[in-house]
């Protein structure tokens, strides 16, 4: 019993001193981040796909905070551009792509898959499941359509397919501005 009390008596001051030193170092050596970049990063989809020309969402957020354009994120689409424009008090710009493509997901032809796991390693959102030397499959609800899994596949068994409109992926066409204006005129 005396040995236990002796060990506690020796270790307790060491732990308290180490904790105080770590707490002081955390406050004194704190790295200040850009609050605008952090808020922009929170709005980006976090797919880390690189389609914007930056290696991930955080570097793109830092570039936006430094003055880069807000319309380079295809996975985020128009909704992200609008949210960024509202945050930064800018005019929303059209998406910087040839055309806005319909949402797509990866599809693995399982009969051709050799189970190399290269696509699993490339997927930034862990939407591909499988084990070594066994076929893999894609969780469509998790897939962001970033295309990063296509290139590493040695047997080209992955393809991108458009998401067919169904109950979960339906888009109503927006009403025409003239219709909205005429409704307001009648209400007034």
From Swiss-Prot:
Question: Gene3D superfamilies recorded for this chain?
Answer: 3.30.70.20, Electron transport complex subunit B, putative Fe-S cluster (1.10.15.40)
Region (Hydrophobic) residue spans: 1-26
In the Enzyme Commission scheme, what number(s) does this protein have?
7.-.-.-
**What does the Swiss-Prot or TrEMBL cofactor note state?**
Binds 3 [4Fe-4S] clusters.
Q: Which UniProt keywords apply?
A: 4Fe-4S, Cell inner membrane, Cell membrane, Electron transport, Iron, Iron-sulfur, Membrane, Metal-binding, Repeat, Translocase, Transport
Q: Which residues bind [4Fe-4S] cluster 3?
A: 123, 143, 146, 149
**Hydrolase among keywords:** no
Quote the subcellular location field of this record: Cell inner membrane
Give me the Gene Ontology terms describing cellular component: plasma membrane
Q: Which PANTHER family match?
A: ION-TRANSLOCATING OXIDOREDUCTASE COMPLEX SUBUNIT B, OXIDOREDUCTASE
Alphabetical list of HAMAP family matching this protein = RsxB_RnfB
Q: How does it assemble?
A: The complex is composed of six subunits: RnfA, RnfB, RnfC, RnfD, RnfE and RnfG.
Q: This chain belongs to which protein, by name? A: Ion-translocating oxidoreductase complex subunit B
Recorded source organism is Pseudomonas paraeruginosa (strain DSM 24068 / PA7) (Pseudomonas aeruginosa (strain PA7))
